[in-house]
UniProtKB/Swiss-Prot annotation:
This is Thioredoxin-like 3-3. Probable thiol-disulfide oxidoreductase that may participate in various redox reactions. The keyword Cell cycle does not apply. InterPro entries: Thioredoxin-like_sf, Thioredoxin_domain, TRL33.
């Protein structure tokens, strides 16, 4: 179930910008579309983490996602909060959802969290 009002998810990211690793944060729908267009046109491998500020599992995996972004430098890492980007993320049914892109196309999707599981999937796509 989606929460209709954001609870300040971006405040955490803005105040801790140095803690984001190599993760691009999409603060709104327009920014997310720009990032997604860049991923598709550059054909660089990428992973998008769709989460929510009110999702406990999302909050648990986000620090690992940030840390892993430094370890997998060939991948572009993106975080999109489903409440901050409601139009472009309306197809997301579970949080967290991770989508993997290669050559501009979505090639894989992972639901749920687990640092080792995420690491293994990132390794597979890097």
């Amino acid at each position: 179930m989606r929460k209709q009002e954001s609870e300040g998810a971006n405040l955490e990211f803005e105040s801790k910008s140095n803690d984001n690793g190599n993760v691009k944060i999409a603060p709104n729908d327009q920014s997310f579309l720009t990032i997604l267009d860049d991923i598709k046109s550059s054909k660089s491998p990428a992973v998008i983490n769709y989460g929510a500020s009110w999702c406990g599992v999302c909050s648990q995996i986000l620090p690992a996602f940030r840390k892993l972004s430094n370890s997998f430098s060939k991948l572009k890492f993106v975080y999109a909060d489903i409440d901050e980007c409601p139009e472009t993320t309306r197809h997301i049914r579970y949080t967290p959802t991770f989508q993997f892109y290669r050559d501009g196309e979505k090639v894989d999707e992972m639901f749920g969290a687990g640092e080792q599981r995420l690491h293994d999937r990132l390794w597979l796509h890097s």
